[in-house]
Amino acid sequence: MFNFFKKGLAKTLENIVGVKGENKKITKDLLEEILLEADVSYEIVEEIIYYLPPQNEVKKEDLKRVMGSYFLYEKKETNQEKPFVELILGVNGAGKTTSIAKLAYLYKNQNQKVILGACDTFRAGAIEQLKLWAQKVDVDIVLTAQGYDPSAVAFDTISKAKAKDFDRVIIDTAGRLQNQKNLAHELEKIVRISNKALEGAPHRKILVLDGTQGNAGILQAKAFNELVKLDGVIITKLDGTAKGGALFSIARELELPIFYVGVGEQMTDLQEFNANAYLDTLLDPIFK
């Protein structure tokens, strides 16, 4: 897990080392500079420094304790329902479809039977793209033609999962319609119809966020959270950014857990988020 985050945060760590320079002693002023360079928001940097002990020199264990408090949001358990239904949301280009494929791969490797629902019937090519991923990962998929009612696809997917004893249902959704009102209506309908197919479904509503956007992705996430009450987020493309510190803002501003992080193109490059490993990766070069 440590090496996984090291790969994902390589650019962020490079910036941290650059700001730290030859300094062995980490003062609060230097820490502020380092954290801002890693795209931790100014407000959170000030908060972190405020909650540290009063002395000017910063100790790793104190900093880790304070920073760890941002990742305490409770994750919904995934082993209570069968099939367990997850609704995946996100704008086009955030890595939503590839994240769905990687999630399916992850679950399949945990000996779970997975089925995908191609409910992005709006974007040209979205159904075909998900179909290709389903073939690559070797999982089932329910799909229709472009323009078909996405809530009907969700209903059919969940119904098949119940009938055929699937463990996991992963439902793709449209990232963009002509306007927000249409998207809100569509997502609300998918949630309502999913619950008709299986009481309590969808069990988790997860937003996929592009890690290269840093703090800018928070506004996007808030908009989705208003449309559909989210349960957590997946952060993608962490390996392509020096903004690894934005995870603090995402967790705090949204008051949501980070479920998974993606750090590359390989199927194994999506892993469950581990706050302890993330903090160690971030802090080790500061206190080297």
Task: Give, region by region, the residue ranges found by the protein language model.
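Non-catalytic terminal/linker segments enriched in charged/polar, low-complexity residues
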Residues: M1-I88, L103-Y105, N109-A118, K136, ...
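P-loop/Walker A NTP-binding module and the surrounding RecA-like catalytic core of P-loop NTPases
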Residues: K76-K288
